[in-house]
UniProtKB/Swiss-Prot annotation:
This is Deoxyribose-phosphate aldolase. One of its GO terms (cellular component) is cytoplasm. It comes from Clostridium perfringens (strain 13 / Type A). Catalyzes a reversible aldol reaction between acetaldehyde and D-glyceraldehyde 3-phosphate to generate 2-deoxy-D-ribose 5-phosphate. InterPro entries: Aldolase_TIM, DeoC, DeoC/FbaB/LacD_aldolase, DeoC_typeI. The active site is at residues 92, 155, 184. Keywords: Cytoplasm, Lyase, Schiff base. Pfam families: DeoC (PF01791). The gene is deoC. The keyword Lyase applies. One of its GO terms (molecular function) is deoxyribose-phosphate aldolase activity.
Length: 224
């Protein structure tokens, strides 16, 4: 896989709360230079990114119910519609982790479906399951519910919890959802070796702030 092909699999990400206008402008400039799949940013930065990336192939990705997933499904649905209206092409939503652990699967599925329905095929939907907080059984169940709810992707992590993507989790997620859905590895992918390991195990997208280091064959100390 060459640098260009790898770049097209990366969501160039900045989700830290202190990200200012200059940070978003820099992120978008880099995304255009490397032709990354998207920029992944917080909802308040969607309008600016959409303006900066207009006419390019780089998509605008934002996050919903982030990073805890503890908002109500009504709030997540509103966030989704609002983000799309402001220019988002992709939305990465966080599941309600507590409800999953309660085995309230009906709630978890409805929560995901609220975002899928709000997106109304106008934006790709990615479901963050926060693998570091789940048992193997819970990871499988979360992926099954995301698939049942009609989401486009499952995603490992927010990058704000206790761990990120591992090749083992990617393999399990890919085996669970099958070949039709996307699988996004995020959190802790900091080098070309990390990227190759998750791709080998079934990742079709990578979320990283270390995107340039990955493409240039370097190693970043970034946490996302």
């Amino acid at each position: 896989m060459d640098k260009q092909q790898l770049a097209k699999m990366i969501d160039h990400t900045i989700l830290k709360p202190e990200a200012d206008k200059a940070s978003i402008e820099k992120l978008c400039k880099e995304a255009l230079e490397y032709n990354f799949a998207s920029v992944c940013i917080n909802p308040t930065n969607v309008e600016l990114a959409a303006k900066l990336l207009k006419g390019s192939e780089v998509k605008v990705c934002t996050v919903i119910g982030f990073p805890l997933g503890a908002n109500t499904m009504e709030v997540k649905a509103f966030e989704t519609k609002d983000a799309i209206a402001k220019g988002a092409d992709e939305v990465d939503m966080v599941i309600n982790i507590g409800r999953l652990k309660d085995k309230d699967y009906e709630y978890v599925e409805k929560d995901i479906k609220a975002v899928v329905d709000a997106a109304d095929k106008k934006a790709l939907t990615k479901v963050i399951i926060e693998t570091c907080l789940l048992t193997e059984e819970e990871k499988v169940k979360a992926c099954e519910l995301a698939k049942k709810a009609g989401a486009d992707f499952v995603k490992t992590s927010t990058g704000f919890s206790t761990g990120g993507a591992t090749p083992e989790d990617i393999k399990l997620m890919r085996e669970t959802v099958g070949p039709e859905m996307g699988v996004k590895a995020s959190g802790g992918v900091r080098s070309i070796e990390d990227a190759e390991a998750v791709i080998k195990n079934g990742a079709t997208r990578i979320g990283a702030s270390a995107s340039i280091a990955i493409c240039e064959g370097k190693v970043s100390d970034s946490t996302y």
